[in-house]
UniProtKB/Swiss-Prot annotation:
Keywords: ATP-binding, Cytoplasm, DNA-binding, Isomerase, Magnesium, Metal-binding, Nucleotide-binding, Topoisomerase, Zinc, Zinc-finger. Binds 1 zinc ion per subunit. PROSITE patterns: HELICASE_ATP_BIND_1, TOPO_IA_2, TOPRIM, ZF_RG_C, ZF_RG_N. GO terms for molecular function: ATP binding; ATP hydrolysis activity; DNA binding; DNA topoisomerase type II (double strand cut, ATP-hydrolyzing) activity; reverse gyrase activity; zinc ion binding. This is Reverse gyrase 1. Mg(2+) binds at E631, D758. Modifies the topological state of DNA by introducing positive supercoils in an ATP-dependent process. Increases the linking number in steps of +1. Has a DNA-stimulated ATPase activity; closed circular ssDNA stimulates ATPase much better than dsDNA although negative supercoiled, positive supercoiled and relaxed dsDNA all stimulate ATPase activity. All NTPs permit topoisomerization (relaxation) of negatively supercoiled dsDNA without nucleotide hydrolysis. It transiently cleaves a single DNA strand and remains covalently bound to the 5' DNA end. Acts via a tyrosine residue. GO terms for cellular component: cytoplasm. In the N-terminal section; belongs to the DEAD box helicase family. DDVD subfamily. In the C-terminal section; belongs to the type IA topoisomerase family.
């Protein structure tokens, strides 16, 4: 970042962290407060030092709460250090801060981050503050461990050694004396710390819930929420009544209804928040777990947070494959060979189609040479023996809910996995499949057939699966196989499945898009890719801030199925890399297996050492808590879901998603876009103060927070202190200052703050404003830049943050001030001078208010664009004439157009002579990937979508991680993008893809790319992934979303293949009167017909992925004439059926305007849609319903005339273009922003 002297000055109203007065950029950059709170210009690196200096001055106001928490934090750290010998590290610091702030929250984090230690030390610290604690653990062994740890801590702390807390505890198997002491302590309520199992809590909830306490720590919340009974026990312990729960149920129902209607939900959050605050006023609740497979919506709403899951998609697994031998004994021998060389710590997964008998035979065969055990629901205790090293290798089923697949988290023990075949779903036609497969196949059938009954039943089945536990799903699947199923929805689902799978056409379509293989025995095989990810992921876990290295070896029993597995894995893992294992050479590609195993063993030994010594401090030192701020909630939700199912904190109206990235605990939240804008108060020149300094002008923009009223009007400044200036309501539903205050508190918790707003000038300005607002609270703030919302791009942005680009900020500042000055100046003239005169001329309308019209506006770019529309309409009117037309009966799709002339009228007959037909083949394309202007143009031309609507859709697709950044004028495609095209074509065409694949970068290097898909998924596959629930998006997609995605995908794929071959026929014609004596004049001397489009080298239907901007492909005219028994020359008599008015000049469409702005260089990717939207919204232009042509209104014509006659030189096309070029030079650091603003300032002073 540049020096302070080069930073553009600004004033932020109501933004001093301490007093809420105005504060300058300079003071915020120092990490300080306003000069009223502190006179000295001093830089601060942390908020603690800042608070101390303010307190010395006796001026501490709003920062008192943070001071209290920081003081308590120091006391807590002192206790922590004395107990453990080292201070808290990484996420523990954030947990402590949140606890001391009185926040209830969930800790969902992998082993080794000190969750239990934190809970125990918290109870001791709170005892020192006179507060009682209840700690709940899932098993008696964990209760005993907690008691032992707590006892040793108490002995190590001098100030409580003589007066220790009274600790009572319960677990099965206690001695009679211990039980008696615990009963007495619980009945008399004289304990300080109470520890019990979850089971005891449920059985004795009435007695325990009557006890007053201040801290509840629930370890292994997954167990605590295992049943509704245990969830109810926790709710009762927290003090929530059945009435509270009924209110929450009703509120959640309202929330769902409002969301579907797109109505406001803020008041619902307020109602829930009120209940929560009433019940938890004096309590802090912390849920802790390594995993979470279930949650309770009532409980999560009441406590104000939603636990997540550490089902981590961050993995460091070497994925290898080798062909599985055909014979069973040869397979067993191969596995033995692998085990001898890999050693202990292995998991062997057997696909479910091989049945339990296969597992028994495999166990028996291996037991002769290795210490192995097969795991089932009845032998799960053997996992403990494996964890302790008494068993070397475990064998289990490769099924999504298998014990080894989901119930194992042993990073110190598990080193590798072997899959004896591809995990799969296998069934025969007519067989009762398991519920997960049933749901997937119904989704496919619904997508293909559009049968409303199937769609309805499919959704009901999905809902059931989401609600049911793994055990319940297994039970229902067994009932279905045994013919004992009674559930009417599921029975209907199976009937529909069998009905459609017996239809060969449906079966064929399913096989085309549904990713399954039909085996020689007519079995349907579907790769179970989620099971592969989960099972292989057991070998690569997070422990104490590190992701362990793992090895996965897949014995491939079907290479077609392997191809489908890999395709599916690419959807959820950005860059999985398969290496073929050479067992004899003991290598896989460039990997020496011996070296890899050595590395894995070293890691496991280090983890075991950390675990046994209980000292994870060195490892935790590198674990950081990172706050990532983006603009939109959708983007925040999408990003957080890349790494696990995140836990959710609800703070006011803001959601904070928390997830784990190995050495980082990531908090992701959204600012809601811009948080500041220029004030509309009477300050300076339209919100910009101007000072003279050393004979130069200094421009100081004055910013205020952004507000929104209940009617969704956006503004910065109230009218009469509390009213929306547009509609005068006093109900304000949003003020960005509230969001800023939440972000400030989060910044105190974090070790690092990253701001990941959009990668353009607007995004940089949002990031800059947030940086300044947060700087006093955290000095470690940087910019995270990414051009696509994918796991890989986000990780790169987080791990390689950059400094803020002040030149981009300056450029945006110039754009905004120029827009404000010229806009406010000319708009006020239109509203107060032009309107009264224009209004009076509309004498027929007496209802109009002719004093002032606030809806009128003018702008630097807006006005030239309006001029184009008006001028084009004038030319259109001048060149209008009538055109007649008729169809050739024998060739219905050929229409003949005839200009108005003597002898041509409706119902008259003419003769069309076909003189010659020439057939030719032309190349089409490839066209480059979309830029903003070409996307807006095609979207308007193909679908009639407006520019603003297309930009909203593209923004959604970007934020949901489906396309790259959409505000771009670059065609460049990165190597990552090229690989997306290659992977897709390889999947669709197999080895033939090389016949058409021709990678192109379309430009030199740089950060920006053309608009492209982020994954090798066409629109049909996208619909299927969403319908199956395999791709869960933060927002529901509409048909228009799919349409826009489809053309983006096609245009991109076409940019990476050879040109299309387009077959055409050119028919030369002449027109005559009915008697064939008089020749008729016509502009139509030829008929051009496209008869085919192909890609040489493949025989696959190209319409699935190729960009073909041709709506109709017709049958050959020559062939049709031959069928009619005609030869060239030949003639047809036609009747003129109708006519219409046509001009030789076409009116503009929105697509045309975008291209015009691009070509004339007076627009930007970020402004095209806004400019067109403003012109339409002001009523200057109307858009025709059918043809989507833009027609100026009388108001638009008069506004254009008035502006050009009186202020033409300020809003001319040439002046606008030159000013935009200057702004680009500011962005590139080639022009001083002050000089550009000086020019604009001098200009507006000339406007009278």
């Amino acid at each position: 970042m540049q020096s302070l002297s080069d930073i553009p000055p600004s004033i932020y109203l109501f933004s001093c962290p301490n007093c809420g007065r105005s504060i300058s950029t300079y003071r915020l950059l120092l990490g300080s407060v306003c000069n009223i709170c502190l006179e000295e210009d001093k830089e601060y690196k942390n908020i603690g030092d800042l608070i101390k200096d303010i307190e010395k001055q006796g001026n501490l106001i709003k920062l008192k709460d943070i001071q209290r928490v920081l003081d308590d934090y120091e006391s807590f750290v002192s206790v922590f250090r004395r107990l453990l010998g080292f201070p808290p590290f990484g996420p523990q610091k954030s947990w402590i801060y949140r606890l001391l702030s009185g926040e209830s929250f969930a800790i969902i984090a992998p082993p080794g981050l000190g969750k239990t230690t934190f809970g125990l030390i918290s109870s001791i610290y709170l005892y020192l503050r006179g507060k009682k604690s209840i700690l709940v653990f899932p098993t008696k062994s964990l209760v005993r461990q907690a008691i032992d740890k707590l006892s040793s801590y108490i002995q190590n702390l001098a100030e409580i050694k003589e007066n220790p807390p009274k600790v009572i505890y319960y677990y099965s198997g206690m001695s009679a004396s211990e039980r008696k002491e615990a009963d007495e302590g619980l009945q008399s309520k004289t304990f300080d710390i109470f520890i019990s199992t979850n089971r005891f809590l449920i059985d004795n909830i009435d007695q325990i819930s009557s006890t007053s306490y201040q801290f509840l720590f629930v370890d292994d919340v997954d167990t605590a929420l295992k049943s509704s009974k245990s969830a109810q026990a926790i709710l009762k312990l927290l003090g929530f009544t059945p009435s509270d729960q009924d209110k929450i149920k009703e509120s959640l129902k309202k929330y769902r209804e409002n969301t579907q209607k797109n109505e406001q939900n803020e008041y619902i959050f307020e109602e829930i928040d009120k209940i929560r605050k009433d019940r938890l006023a004096s309590k802090t609740v912390i849920f802790s777990s390594a995993t979470l497979n279930r949650s309770n919506p009532i409980l999560t709403s009441l406590v104000g947070f939603k636990p997540g899951s550490s089902v981590i998609y961050i993995r460091k697994v070497y994925d290898m494959y080798v062909k599985q031998p055909d014979k069973e004994q040869e397979t067993f021998n191969l596995i033995k060979s692998l085990l001898h060389r890999l050693g202990d710590g292995g998991l062997i997964f057997v696909p479910v189609d091989k049945k339990q008998e296969y597992i028994k035979r495999l166990q028996s065969e291996l037991s002769n040479e290795f210490n192995v055990a097969a795991i089932t629901s009845t032998s799960a205790t053997k996992i403990d023996d494996f964890a302790n090293g008494e068993i070397d290798v475990l064998i289990g089923s490769a099924t999504h809910y298998g014990i080894l697949v989901r119930g194992l988290d042993l990073p110190w023990r598990v080193k590798y996995s072997i899959f004896v075949g591809i995990p799969k779903f296998k069934f025969r036609l007519g067989e009762k499949v398991n519920l997960l497969t049933l749901s997937r196949l119904l989704s496919l059938i619904a997508l293909i057939t559009k049968d409303q009954e199937v769609i309805y039943i499919s959704r009901r089945v999905k809902d059931k699966i989401r609600r049911l536990s793994p055990a319940a799903l297994t039970m229902l699947s067994v009932q279905a196989k045994e013919g004992k199923l009674e559930d009417s929805i599921l029975l209907k689902a199976y009937d529909l499945l069998n009905k459609y799978l017996s239809n060969q056409n449906v079966l064929k379509r399913i096989s085309e898009i549904g990713d399954f293989v039909l085996s020689p025995d007519n079995d349907i095989l579907i790769p179970d890719y989620l099971t592969y990810v989960q099972a292989s992921g057991r070998t690569s876990r997070i422990y104490a801030g590190d992701v362990t290295t793992g090895l996965s070896i897949l014995l491939v029993d079907d290479f077609n199925l392997f191809r489908l597995l890999n395709k599916k894995l690419q959807y959820i893992l950005d860059d999985i890399q398969w290496r073929e294992l050479d067992v004899e050479k003991w290598t896989a590609g460039d990997v020496e297996i011996k070296n890899l195993i050595s590395k894995i063993n070293e890691e496991r030994n280090e983890i075991s050492k950390l675990k046994n010594e209980g000292n994870v401090a060195p490892a935790l030192q590198k674990v950081k808590t990172v706050l990532l701020v983006v603009e939109s909630p959708n983007k925040a939700k999408t990003i957080s879901s890349f790494f696990s199912r995140p836990s959710i904190r609800q703070i006011g109206n803001m959601r904070v998603y928390e997830t784990v990235l190995g050495d980082k605990v990531l908090m992701v939240t959204a600012s809601g876009g811009h948080v500041y804008d220029l004030t509309t108060q009477d300050m300076g020149i339209y919100g910009v103060d101007i000072m003279k300094q050393n004979s130069s002008l200094v421009f100081i923009p004055i910013y205020n927070s952004i507000k929104k009223c209940e009617n969704n009007h956006q503004f910065t400044d109230f009218f009469e202190s509390n009213k929306c200036p547009r509609c005068m309501t006093t109900k304000v539903r949003y003020d960005s200052l509230k969001s800023i205050n939440v972000l400030r508190n989060l910044a105190v918790e974090a070790d690092e703050v990253l701001i990941g707003t959009d990668p353009d000038t607007e995004g940089e300005k949002i990031a800059w404003d947030l940086y300044l607002a947060l700087r006093p609270y955290n000095s470690n703030i940087r910019r995270a830049e990414f051009h696509e919302v994918t796991r890989k791009a986000i990780l790169q942005a987080i791990n390689q943050p950059r400094e803020f680009n002040v030149n981009l900020v300056k450029s945006q500042l110039v754009r905004r001030i120029e827009d404000r000055w010229i806009g406010f100046k000319l708009s006020s003239i239109l509203q107060t001078r032009f309107w009264p005169e224009y209004c009076k001329s509309l004498s027929s309308n007496k209802q109009l208010n002719c004093n002032e019209n606030k809806n009128l506006s003018a702008g630097r770019v807006q006005t030239p664009v309006l001029s184009w529309i008006v001028d084009r309409y004038t030319e259109y009117q001048r060149n209008k004439s009538r055109v007649y037309y008729g169809k050739i009966d024998q060739l219905q799709d050929i229409v003949i157009y005839v200009p108005k002339q003597d002898g041509v009228r409706k119902n008259s007959k003419i003769v069309v002579v076909f003189n010659e037909i020439n057939q030719l083949e032309e190349e089409f394309g490839p066209l480059p990937p979309y830029t903003t202007d070409t996307l807006l143009s095609d979207s308007n031309n193909f679908f009639g979508l407006s520019a603003p609507e297309t930009m909203r859709i593209a923004q959604d697709l970007f934020e949901l991680g489906l396309i790259t950044y959409h505000r771009t004028d670059s065609n460049r495609i990165s190597n990552t993008g090229i690989s997306v095209a290659e992977n897709y074509l390889k999947d669709v065409l197999g080895d033939k893809y090389t016949n058409i694949f021709k990678p192109r970068s379309w430009g030199d290097g740089g950060a920006h790319e053309g608009i492209r898909p982020t994954k090798p998924i066409d629109v049909e596959q996208l619909r299927l992934l969403i319908e199956e629930g395999e791709l869960e998006l933060a927002k529901r997609l509409t048909n228009n979303h799919f349409k826009v995605y489809d053309i983006i995908f096609r245009r991109f794929i076409s940019s990476q293949i050879i040109p299309l071959k387009v077959r055409k026929e050119i028919v030369k014609i002449e027109l005559y009167g009915e008697n064939k004596k008089e020749k008729i004049n016509s502009n139509q001397n030829i008929i051009e017909v496209i008869t085919g489009i192909t890609l040489p080298g493949i025989d696959t239907e190209i319409s699935k992925f190729a960009y073909v901007p041709v709506r109709n492909v017709s049958r050959s005219v020559a062939e049709r004439l031959k069928e009619l028994g005609r030869s060239i020359p030949t003639d047809f008599s036609i009747e003129i059926s109708n006519s219409f008015i046509k001009s030789t000049v076409n009116l503009y469409t929105q697509a045309d305007l975008v291209m015009e702005m691009k070509n004339k260089k007076i627009g930007r990717p970020s402004t095209y849609a806004t400019i067109i939207g403003t012109i339409l919204r002001r009523g200057y232009v109307l858009e025709s319903l059918k043809t989507k042509k833009l027609i100026p209104t009388r108001l638009g014509v008069e506004v254009n005339k008035y502006l050009n006659e009186n202020y033409g030189r300020f809003v001319s096309e040439d002046r606008t273009r030159k000013l935009l070029q200057l702004m680009d030079m500011v962005e590139a650091g080639q022009e001083k922003y002050e000089e550009v603003l000086k020019q604009v300032y001098e200009e507006i002073n000339e406007i009278r």
